[in-house]
Every structure is written in structure tokens, then in C-alpha cells.
Amino acid sequence: MGMVSEFKQFAMRGNVIDLAVGVVIGAAFGKIVTALVEKIIMPPIGWAIGNVDFSRLAWVLKPAGVDATGKEIPAVVIGYGDFINTVVQFVIIAFAIFLVVKLINRLSQRKPDAPKGPSEEVLLLREIRDSLKNDTLKNPTVP
């Protein structure tokens, strides 16, 4: 029973729950970014450089074929277009995270409080100093 209660205590800590929420939101955000890149950003870029569909860009190392027994042999392909899409997705996600962290840092930095006036002791010492100065000016013979 000790291990179960320890696990429950671990799982219910704030950090673990925050992490779980972050993972779920991150997965959903990843899908949004994927759709943004594949459906909104890359098509105009592909159109601008000559109607290129980045998701279909690939180097065919060995074309598909059929062996002697009639069995189909799939092509060997390096799909660099998908890699380009993934890099663009990464840049967008990294920039979004940068903006969020920057916002959090800005919000967490407390503005320094306005400097408080001098303490009562300092005010009293100033008053004594000024009083002594005035006495010295009025009666310069007093040592």
C-alpha cells in the first residue's frame, strides 16, 4: 500500500499535473502548426517558386519495380519535402515558445517599488543636524 500512496502523492503534485496539461496542449498545438504549415504557409511558397508541392519533393534512389516472381518492389525514396515542412513547423513552434517565454518573463519581472522616503531615524538626525547648524550660525562662538 505504501507504493500506491507514494505514487498517488507523486502524481497529484502540481508539477506533474502541469506537465501533463502541457503535453496535451503541446500535442494539440503541434496539430495546429502542422495544418498551418501544410495548408496555409507552404502552398503559397510553393506557388511562388513554380507550383511546387513541398510534401511531394523527393529524391528517388531506386524506382519501384517488379522482381522476377512478379512481386512488387517499392521505390527507395528520400522525401526531403517532408523534411522542409518539418523544419518550417519547428521554426514556427520554436518562435511561438520564444514569444510565450518572453511574455512570461516580462510578466514575472516585478517593477521595483518606488523608493521609500528616509526612515524616522534619518529624519530625526537631519533635524538635529539642521538645528545644530542653525545654532552655530546664530552663535558662532559656541564650540
From Swiss-Prot:
Belongs to the MscL family. One of its GO terms (biological process) is monoatomic ion transport. The keyword Lipid biosynthesis does not apply. PROSITE patterns: MSCL (PS01327). One of its GO terms (cellular component) is plasma membrane. Channel that opens in response to stretch forces in the membrane lipid bilayer. May participate in the regulation of osmotic pressure changes within the cell. Homopentamer. It comes from the Bacteria. InterPro entries: Mechanosensitive_channel_CS, MS_channel, MSC/AndL, MscL_channel. It is a multi-pass membrane protein. Pfam families: MscL. Keywords: Cell inner membrane, Cell membrane, Ion channel, Ion transport, Membrane, Transmembrane, Transmembrane helix, Transport. Gene3D superfamilies: Large-conductance mechanosensitive channel, MscL, domain 1. It comes from Xanthomonas campestris pv. campestris (strain ATCC 33913 / DSM 3586 / NCPPB 528 / LMG 568 / P 25). Its main location: membrane. One of its GO terms (molecular function) is mechanosensitive monoatomic ion channel activity. The chain crosses the membrane at residues 16-36, 84-104. The keyword Ribosomal protein does not apply. It is found in: Cell inner membrane. The lineage of its organism: Bacteria, Pseudomonadati, Pseudomonadota, Gammaproteobacteria, Lysobacterales. Signal peptide: none annotated. This is Large-conductance mechanosensitive channel.
